[in-house]
Amino acid sequence: MYLSVPLALPINSNPGLAAKSRTFSTQKEAAVFLARFLTELLNYQEVLDSSSLEVEQVKSKDGKTMQPLCMAQHYQMYRIYRRPGIKGDEQVILDRTTSGNHIIFAHHNQFYSVPVRAPDRGRITEDELVQQILKIMGTKADPRTPPVGILTTMKRPAWAKARDELLKHEQNRHNLELLERCLCVVCIDDDILPATFNNSLKKEDRWIGDRDYANVLHHVLHGGGSRHLGANRWFDKTFHAILGKDGMWGMNYEHSAGEGPAIFITFEELTEKVDAMSPPEENTVPSHLPAPEKLEWYLSEQTLNDIRDAMISFDTLVEDLDICILWFQEYSKDFIKSHRISPDVYIQLALQFTHFRLHGNLVATYESAGIRRFALGRVDCIRAASPEALAWAMAMCQGDPENQSANQQNSNLEEGTKRVQFTIYSEERIKELFDLAVQRQTKEMNDNINGHGIDNHLMGLRYAAQEAGEPVPDIFTDQAYKIVNHFALSTSQVSNNNK
């Protein structure tokens, strides 16, 4: 589902999350915040290493008992690295005895390795980590140094070839191994995106500090491309913590390792623990640890050309992305639930209705359905374009001039023929049709999360035929199959406690 897709990771695959921004009066305060977050992350990693993470539970299908969820995604999130390949990427499963003992920091497009564990002394202290972070924060930008991190923004086959070129030098091999085996990447961004980046400002927009929500989402998704912070990343690594110059706090993660809830909720919980801590003591004990190891690269002319190509292609990708945010306040999900309707079902039907009103037809829609009720379960696809949704949308649009125009364009009426539109649906009948659409969509949602969706089964059939050397089954070459799998709308939701 992920590893065979040749597209670039940022925007196309890696999700981003922007949390509430921080306020720091000094650089040291920012370093303390990062050190405390990373200390909590190390604590969390030790819980994972001891296999003692509390098992999450949800209501079972009968609604009376609780059912455990598979926790594999939590345990593998910090043990996976996505390595590019020409014909398909490789998911590297890291050995915990030889990985996760150092953290990579990105600053001014340069990378630094900081050991956080040592066999002879155990874990680094919070105070020592603060001092290491301050050393990195004190480094200066060097515009002459090529931004190697930009290579991870390339299409995967191109990045695989560029990586092969890097591997020709021993020092580069050492650097790539450090990046693969680190616990995570921490991006210290000494810049912010311009306030109007890719979006015209509006007074009614929601703001985080001096930037609107769309701006900070651009920041965590792609960093603004090569002209801003896009090279201060290593997108192949599963987890990036991102701290902006203005206190912007967020994350970016590589999607093949797991789904959003497994990493977003952990990020949120660790951040809340740090926020609840008291201010640190002013006195610090000088550290005698070696300075952070800067990753020095040996770049051939071919690699320099690859970097230039990556900058151009990444900037083109970034410029093609628009982010628009609707902050709806007329009513909340509690109002929807009070009518015994799932908010998820409600939104999916609203999207189908909107598309029908705009274009005169429903649309193939993808929504991920978590299937962690099953061992190693990831997702299946909740679809929303149903006959019941169509009947309700048509009833809602009766007498709508725009809809009549769309239907006229989609019909085969001869020139000069007039279409007569009658209003035949009462409000009561429209409500009945809506109830039927809700029932159908609710069943679709429940079928998927309980393992009765169609997409995973069909995908299994297709791959089984390939592995057996058999022809592709006819269903996969049928025009109808192509239509229902062209998702003009891709939707997802991840609940969290932090607005």
List the predicted regions and their residue ranges.
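Acyl-CoA-dependent O-acyltransferases
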Residues: 1-240, 244-499
